[in-house]
A protein has these predicted regions:
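N-terminal positioning helix adjacent to the helix-turn-helix/winged-helix DNA-binding module
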Residues: 122, 145, 149-152, 174
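Long, low-complexity, charged/polar intrinsically disordered regions in eukaryotic proteins
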Residues: 122-141
Length: 217
């Protein structure tokens, strides 16, 4: 856990001794969740979390049970920071995308820890994390702005290719999660992926995609 926390953006620039003190003041608790396990739900008290292993999805679920995936949280990354800083209940649900170990911190502890060594740096780190997450959410809005399933897939996969520095990309979603993220029907999306492969746009196996150099067809 210490290796993950030492590299986590939330604790960047905070010496180990100060980090240990902050964790105590914030009521740190390590919990394990099975795949599809609920880490927290919409309306729960605010919680600040760091993924230690596995991965989580941040979701919006309406009263009819329709789910939209807003983000994927990988090891070392943070979730719940906006609600913890605002002192508001969770406005989203967070679910384990696979077996995951998570460090949970009390949201209200952010204010209670004021004056604790490293607290000011922690808040600065949270500001940077929030800004970067807003950029990620903005990119999702670009992907879902496309009117066709193909357009949404191309927008998302192109963005991943840029982020990963090559035409071979590994995405953090399975098919259902990708469909939920892009706001499309899974069966229709799978059919469109098959058509895109037939058209020579890409090849894929599970969550690994290779984008061809030309996007014709």
């Amino acid at each position: 856990m210490e290796k993950i926390l030492a590299k986590a953006p939330l604790f960047q620039g905070i010496p180990e001794g100060e980090r240990v003190g902050l964790l105590e003041r914030l009521g740190a608790e390590v919990r394990w969740f099975p795949k599809a396990g609920a880490v927290c739900r919409n309306g729960d008290p605010a919680v600040l979390g760091v993924v230690l292993s596995g991965g989580l999805t941040v979701e919006n679920v309406d009263v009819w049970g329709n789910k939209t995936i807003l983000d994927h949280i990988a090891p070392g990354q943070v979730f719940g920071e906006a609600f913890a800083c605002a002192g508001e209940p969770m406005g989203v649900s967070v679910t384990a995308a696979e077996e995951s170990e998570v460090l949970l911190l009390r949201g209200e502890g952010l204010l209670e820890a004021r004056g604790c060594p490293g607290h000011e740096r922690l808040l600065r780190n949270l500001l940077v994390i929030s800004a970067r997450k807003n950029l990620r959410l903005s990119r999702r809005s670009f992907h879902t702005a496309a009117k066709t399933i193909r357009g949404r897939l191309l927008s998302y996969l192109s963005d991943q290719a840029v982020a990963q520095g090559g035409r071979e990309v590994v995405i953090p979603f399975d098919r259902q999660q990708l469909a939920d993220y892009l706001g499309v029907d899974r069966s229709a999306m799978s059919h469109e992926l098959s058509r895109m492969r037939e058209d020579g746009l890409l090849t894929y196996r599970k969550n690994r995609f290779v984008l061809n150099e030309t996007l014709e067809g």
